[in-house]
């Protein structure tokens, strides 16, 4: 199985979700199924059906997270020393060359990506354009509105 890069923070979030699923959600679902069974006829028992559906979701999510964590290559950006080069986990300050607008992104794994928080997926067009570049370089990105050029103002490993 191929390794999946994930930041330390992303791995901690997945572990916290897994813990909640195993210690809160799973016991709740088991109890809900037990209570629904106690009501008698299961063939027309909506509570039982809903609890079984929830159980399927919870167990599926537990397996999914377990799989991701077992294949994860956890990277702590604060321990990186890439000499100003953009790598997975780095935080990059950019200036859009046409408008002068400044943005800051951290390059993260698929499960961590949230553009509103400035977290971009390693396989996104902007991350692919930035990887390997250094401070002062220009990255050209194919955006929905056309090509955009960004100057890399700073690269941080935080």
Predicted segments with their positions:
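Helix-rich terminal scaffold detector
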Residues: 1-63, 158
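Flexible, active-site-adjacent loop/turn segments at secondary-structure boundaries
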Residues: 2-4, 40, 72, 86, ...
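Acidic side chains
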Residues: 17, 41, 49, 53, ...
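Structured, basic alpha/beta domains of bacterial-type, RNA-associated proteins
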Residues: 59-79
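Non-DNA-binding regulatory cores of transcription-related proteins
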Residues: 75-158
